[in-house]
Amino acid sequence: MTSTPVVALQKPKGISIEEIESELRNIWRTQDEGATAPVATRATTFSIVVYEPEEFQQLLAALTFYKGDIDGQHGNKTREAIRQAQMAYGLRVTGRIDEATLTRLRQEYEQLADSQKQFSNPDLRGFNLSEAIAAQNPCRVITLCPTLDGDDTVTAQVSAYCPVQKRNTSNLICCEYISLRGSKASLERVSGMVSSLMIGDLPKFVWWKATPNPEQALFNQLFATSNCLIVDSSYFSEVESELNKIQEITESGKYIADLNWHRLFPWQELTAEAYDPPERRDALIEIDQVSIDHEPGNAAQALMFLGWLASRLEWTPMRYVEEGGDYGIRKVYFESSVGNREIEVELAAIPVADVGEVIGDLIGIRLSSSNQEADCCTILCSETTGCMRMEAGGGAQACRVEEVSAISDQRADLILGQQLQRWGEDVLYQESLAMADQILRLCP
């Protein structure tokens, strides 16, 4: 990705929350009074609130496992700190945060004396400007940074930055940045003020970088005043119940976008292409055996892909069976709309050696038929893991085999840049989510 140079119109400045609007007005007043080329003007595009808890980086820092910045970037330092904590506490070592690890970190943190709960790691939330967001020229970015302490105060910092566009160097289109820090309880108390900071007559986005919680006042306040709630289901700790929550919110008439859905695009595209030839398209109705492999820890991608496939082929979910075992096997049985045929789908969580930043990525898909004469067998697999397991299912020579190239843009903030260009509702996502919801409601 090409780097976008950014000019600081005003570097972060600490102020009281009551001074936010007046301080921002001062920035532009100063610019108007001393106007020389290049001219800086405020963008008139959209506002976005980013809820960035980063609880586990803070817990790891307080417990002395993590020495890096609190920045939301789950890179090598963060993964190594998680591994060290998991080894220290006798947990399964994965280098990823799961529910058991997070629960243990919280327990250990609560046992610390107040003086031990402090840490010196730089908190860069709200300061590490995402190029992907900056390139969309937002009008105002408001970052909410919950802290672990019980302090009742909320601190504020404001700044303004201007991406330098090569096509137009005489004018700078600039964005206001507001960062609010405080405990969860204190941020809850100022939720009304946060909503008022979003520019009234412009589109309003909320990027909720956590599990959606309709029982949380701050979530409800921001959600009610936004045009679009953006989530990333790869963050979800209990995928099944949380996808159900997302479906309930969608049914209420609110627009939700899931960044994890974008990660499925190459898989969907290759699946569709596999059945473009007329003779293969006619054999689609013969598919009655499906295998979907994904990385352990989060089944959101697998469930959404299955929701997409089943909704396109008009399958009706009938039964859901948890078989468990080393791969956490789950089976879903559908009824076809043509001929009342039964379709069996197997979802498996397959451990991989090279885990990436995103939890639960798809690694393999096999579509086939019990009718050996049907030309419908298709195998898709990640180029990083290969097709061996899927081909071992038999009949590989009669299958169309495709490798899915690794996506360089899988990081959430980069996908967000794409989402901010698409302000309309995604009907395909909504229909796929609705089908995934139907499947999950069959869970025993």
Residue positions per predicted region:
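Coiled-coil-based assembly segments and adjacent low-complexity tails used as scaffolding interfaces
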Residues: 1, 44-48, 62, 74, ...
